[in-house]
A protein has these predicted regions:
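Acidic donor-binding segment of Leloir-type glycosyltransferases
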Residues: 2-49, 90-91
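Glycine-centered short loops/turns at secondary-structure junctions
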Residues: 10-12, 137, 179
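Long helical/loop segments within the catalytic core of UDP-sugar-dependent glycosyltransferases
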Residues: 35-66, 80-165, 176
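Short aromatic/hydrophobic "clamp" motif used to bind/position activated sugar donors
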Residues: 69
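Active-site acidic Asp-centered loop
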Residues: 72-74
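Acidic donor-binding loop at a coil-to-helix junction in glycosyltransferase catalytic cores
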Residues: 165-171
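Catalytic donor-sugar/metal-binding loop of nucleotide-sugar-dependent glycosyltransferases
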Residues: 172-190
Length: 197
């Protein structure tokens, strides 16, 4: 995941790596042993009473300086050209497209019966349900990763609700309420499926 990447048109990607909180010693130890490329930096989220992913993303947002804000989870394995595709797609989309959602699937579908169930669920969701919602013009409830926003749109809709643990679906509906569309990106990010009950 921490491979040096750049977008199309010669524009560098600035990636902000955020541990869940200052007390996240496991992530801090892993990052201490990792040499980050120049375009990546670590933003440590201070401890607080609310300890959610959306709170951490809201905290990190002011440190991001790009026109496009993307979200990846630590275990994600996006294809090497995914960021290129995001830039090209946003350049070709009208301004009312505020977000691109990549497909998600798993790199360990054969780990257990449970992981196979998750794989079938994601395949159905990203290959059938979301395209059907898009074709009908209905709001797209976003996945929490491999999702990319125009920065100005994200700011306009109020970014993430720090108290909502389904912040991704909430933000997808809020984008629609503000008149923005979500388009689906033909690119699949693999992540780890739960394999133990």
């Amino acid at each position: 995941m921490i491979a040096a990447r750049s977008t199309g048109a010669g524009r560098p990607v600035s990636l902000t790596v955020k541990p869940a909180a200052a007390s996240d010693s496991v992530t801090a130890a892993a990052l201490a042993q990792t040499v980050l490329p120049d375009h990546m930096r670590v933003v440590v989220v201070p401890d607080g009473t609310v300890k959610t992913k959306p709170r951490a993303m809201n905290f990190a947002l002011p440190f991001c300086n790009g026109d496009v804000i993307g979200i990846y989870d630590a275990e994600d394995a996006p294809p090497a050209d995914q960021l290129h595709r995001v830039v090209e797609r946003f350049a070709a989309c009208p301004p009312d497209v505020g977000c691109l959602q990549a497909r998600l699937n798993f790199y360990n579908p054969r780990a257990s019966w449970l992981s196979r169930c998750f794989c079938v669920d994601y395949a159905t969701w990203f290959a059938l349900v979301l395209p059907a919602l898009r074709k009908l013009g209905w709001p797209i409830p976003l996945g929490g990763t491999s999702v990319f926003f125009r920065r100005d749109v994200l700011d306009r809709v109020g970014a993430w609700d720090a108290h909502n643990v389904t912040e991704d679906a909430d933000l997808g509906l809020r984008l629609a309420r503000f008149g923005y569309r979500v388009e689906l990106l033909r690119s699949t990010t693999l992540e780890e499926a739960p394999f133990r009950p």
